[in-house]
Amino acid sequence: MKWNKYSIQTTTDAVDMISSALNDIGIEGIEIEDNVQLTKEEAKSMFVDFIPDLPPDDGRAKVNFYIDSEEDDGSMLEKVKAELEDLRMFIDIGEGTITESETEDKDWINNWKQYWHTFTIGDLFIKPTWEPETEEMKGHAVLSIDPGTAFGTGSHETTRMVIKQLQKYVKDGDEVLDVGCGSGILSVVALKYGAKHAFGTDLDPNAIIASEENAEQNNIDKKQLEVIEGNIIDDKAVKDACGYECYDIVCANILADVLEPLSTCIHEHMKHGAYFITSGIIDTKENEVAEAFKKNPELEIVEINHDGEWVNITARRK
């Protein structure tokens, strides 16, 4: 099936009104393109591999919608133009021009799989669930994940750096805390390298489901990995559930703006001599996060690593 894609050139202030108008005339599946930065609250709730730094918001935006090319007789486009003219009477919609292009409907659910194959980080093999284990993998740790459902796949620089640090610092029998655990793959990796138990926290309830699925896929006993929803920074119930001074390793692959307040209190959950492994830090935020770590007298930075424009900071509790 082919689709006609229409893009309305407008302003960020007009996006909501235009989207509502399109919905009112029967258009669904609206797509918005802009450079509006996330608020701090929005950022805290997003636990993906990374969030790219956008160019400055210049007030411009695109609202895209799609019409089946076989059913597109031009009548819907005329309705859209009429709606835009009506909106001009009340708000500034900017250019309000519409450009057209054609796109082909593909099996997006499965076609991307042809580009995703097994890769390694150190001696860890990370493979998609549809690929079998090979002779080469025998005797090595293997992480099997479904990239279609996981929050993070391990391929991004931030995740890769944390995994390398886990390979370096995890010891047999360790207790691990995974803050902002997302898909739980860092916890699963730690368990594969000898950790006894991992406890994860995340603001997104879907993280619990994703972590459970990844644990099951990797033959991790349910008792070895626990995940709860909540904010470890300021929710006492979550802090109590995690426990105090009981972790050998704490990992957090989250945004710099969250790592800064986390660094003021994370030592409460760490044993003396435990490691705090972090990433999700864009290089422009490195000094800011490092200074936040240094302000906590309980922590000392032992490593700072770079991969592309991303940074890992590993600290130890004194």
From Swiss-Prot:
Presence of the UniProt keyword Cytoplasm in the record: yes
Entry EC number(s): 2.1.1.-
Assigned keywords, A-Z: Cytoplasm, Methyltransferase, S-adenosyl-L-methionine, Transferase
Residues at which S-adenosyl-L-methionine binds: T159, G180, D202, N253
Any Gene Ontology CC annotation: cytoplasm
Catalytic activity line of the entry: L-lysyl-[protein] + 3 S-adenosyl-L-methionine = N(6),N(6),N(6)-trimethyl-L-lysyl-[protein] + 3 S-adenosyl-L-homocysteine + 3 H(+)
Enzyme class at the top of the EC tree: transferase
Subcellular location: Cytoplasm
Primary role: Methylates ribosomal protein L11.
Membership in a protein family: Belongs to the methyltransferase superfamily. PrmA family.
PANTHER family in the record: ELECTRON TRANSFER FLAVOPROTEIN BETA SUBUNIT LYSINE METHYLTRANSFERASE (PTHR43648:SF1)
Protein known as: Ribosomal protein L11 methyltransferase
Species classification: Bacteria, Bacillati, Bacillota, Clostridia, Lachnospirales
Gene responsible for this protein: prmA
